[in-house]
Amino acid sequence: ACKTKFEISETPLSSIPVLCPNCGSLARPHIVWFGESYDESLIQEAVSFLRQCDVLLVIGTSGMVSMPGFLTEQAFRAQRIELNPEPSGITPLVQISIRAKAAEAMPLFWERLNAG
């Protein structure tokens, strides 16, 4: 696979399985599956960003895999907020935990954020 990135909306659903428009191989989502490793350069880029951010909003993770916790810890100067219906492995790492579903809470969050 050539790792070409493209929007799935550009591909008609009638052409399933979705193939890469560049090389013709099976397309896959731009995510890391369980058992796969992360691209080290992307991790370093994320860590650099997180160490400089003011606010980190962590939405909907169980925290049962190590990377979300590791990345949350890297935002050590930031106000860390968790949005999750249940306590998670991230809960001890944040200053604020909001117990709600993202679909319900995010519209209110954005409304307040945009209000100033």
Task: Give the residues covered by each predicted segment.
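Conserved catalytic alpha/beta core of Sir2/sirtuin-type deacylases, generalized to analogous enzyme cores
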Residues: 1-116
